[in-house]
Design a protein with these regions (language model features):
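Core segments of cupin and vicinal oxygen chelate
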Residues: 8-52
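Vicinal oxygen chelate
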Residues: 9-14, 73-113, 118
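Short glycine-/small-residue motifs
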Residues: 50, 122-125
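Long, continuous compositionally biased terminal/linker segments
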Residues: 41-77, 83-84, 91
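Short beta->alpha transition motifs characteristic of CBS
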Residues: 107, 114, 126-132
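N-terminal beta-strand motif that seeds the catalytic metal site of vicinal oxygen chelate
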Residues: 1-16, 72, 129-132
Length: 132
């Protein structure tokens, strides 16, 4: 099982502003915050990977087509949760790449939305159930 993922970002304060309200919608809660790092853990003691954000010391820009992180996908319990996340990121001004929809090219059921965070990282909320 994956223990944690660390991601460098150019502006940790902006990351806290963006990810603070988003992560509870993805079933994550704050783990810790310092001057140089911000971390979230699976909510309510669930097992899963922790997510750490660090202040980048070099800004080379980000592209998901280059070697490195392509995107992060968060599994949520229901399709309604996918829709809730979609509404939140739209209201936060995120660029939505794909609104909530079925993805028949992936093993079903696969219902997801994709968007970009303020730093250009592609994120996904996905539900692997038929239930709303």
């Amino acid at each position: 099982m994956l223990g944690h993922i660390g991601i460098n970002l150019p502006d940790l304060a902006a990351a806290a502003t963006y990810y603070g309200p988003l992560m509870p919608l993805l079933d994550y809660e704050p783990f810790f915050s310092t001057e140089n790092a911000l971390a979230f853990m699976p909510a309510e003691g669930r097992r899963g990977a922790y997510l750490f954000f660090y202040e980048a010391t070099e800004d080379r820009g980000y592209t998901r087509e280059a070697t490195g992180l392509q995107h992060l996908a968060f599994v949520v319990p229901s399709r309604d949760d996918v829709r809730t996340v979609h509404s939140h990121v739209r209201s936060a001004g995120s660029t939505v790449l794909h609104p909530p929809q079925e993805w028949p090219q992936y093993p079903p059921p696969y219902f997801a939305t994709f968007w970009l965070d303020p730093f250009g990282i592609m994120l996904e909320a996905v539900c692997h159930h038929d239930r709303d």
